[in-house]
């Protein structure tokens, strides 16, 4: 009987030890970086640098509530340019970046939480453009503008379309109107929102060539326990209708 008691006690201690290991260090803080990518993430004042409560948007509101529900500390900074932010998320332990497309070639570079929302990939042209496209291959003959470091630009380059990239995606709207490019490869609704910010309206979609899901990408150093807690919190938010409610504020 004493032997059985020891075995039972030992099993209980193992369970308790596992529970302790699963607890997140209360002092641990995830360093979150984002960019101006409306309506998902944006600085309240429209600038290229903001922190904490001075950042809003669909993904920002979801991520803030997700971390709150999971009981995990975070800091949040909006910076520029995206290529630099992405590199920091890739290389810095304890960092995370959002929102970014979860592509097969990126799968093993991060730990992922999401999806936070959809992002259709489109080719936009001026309202009076005569360009008609049925495939990406047909776009090869045109000058295409894209956003440096973005999944869309990377995908186009991989397929040999050689996009002309810029550090601010809204600059492509102006380049389009000035005739410096024929097409703008961007996300929808983000592209139209950015275009309006620089006074460009009436752009037309000549091709919709992909539909991606946007995620929070965490550095691989972030523990699996934290990733699981965040994913569980997001799943619960979606189940409760909170994600839809947040999207309704902006769209």
Describe each PLM feature range.
Residues 24-101, 108, 146:
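Extracytoplasmic small-molecule ligand-binding "clamshell" domains
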Residues 34-37, 119-122, 196-231:
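Periplasmic-binding protein-like
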Residues 38, 52-65, 126-159, 165-167, ...:
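Bilobed "Venus flytrap"/periplasmic-binding protein-like clamshell domains
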Residues 77-138, 149, 207:
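Acidic, polar ligand-binding/catalytic clefts
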């Amino acid at each position: 009987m004493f032997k059985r008691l020891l075995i039972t006690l030992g099993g209980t201690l193992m369970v308790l030890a596992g529970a302790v290991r699963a607890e997140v260090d209360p002092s641990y803080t995830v360093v979150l970086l984002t960019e101006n990518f409306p309506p998902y993430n944006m600085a309240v004042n429209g600038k290229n640098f903001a922190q904490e409560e001075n950042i809003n948007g669909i993904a920002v509101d979801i991520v803030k509530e997700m971390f709150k529900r999971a009981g995990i500390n975070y800091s949040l900074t909006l910076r520029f340019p995206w290529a630099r932010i992405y590199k920091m998320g890739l290389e810095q332990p304890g960092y995370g970046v959002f929102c970014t497309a979860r592509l097969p070639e990126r799968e093993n570079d991060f730990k992922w939480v999401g999806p936070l929302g959809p992002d259709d990939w489109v080719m936009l042209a001026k309202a009076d453009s005569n360009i008609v496209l049925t495939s990406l291959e047909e776009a090869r003959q045109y000058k295409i503008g894209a956003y440096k470091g973005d999944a869309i630009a990377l995908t186009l380059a991989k397929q040999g379309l050689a996009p002309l990239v810029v550090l601010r995606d809204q600059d492509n709207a102006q380049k389009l109107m000035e005739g410096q490019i024929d097409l703008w490869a961007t996300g929808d609704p983000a592209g139209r929102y950015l275009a309006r910010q620089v006074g460009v309206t009436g752009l037309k979609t000549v091709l919709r060539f992909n539909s991606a899901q946007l995620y929070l990408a965490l550095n691989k150093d972030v523990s699996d326990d934290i990733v699981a807690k965040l994913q569980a919190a997001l799943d619960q938010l979606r189940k409760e209708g909170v994600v839809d409610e947040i999207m309704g504020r902006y769209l």
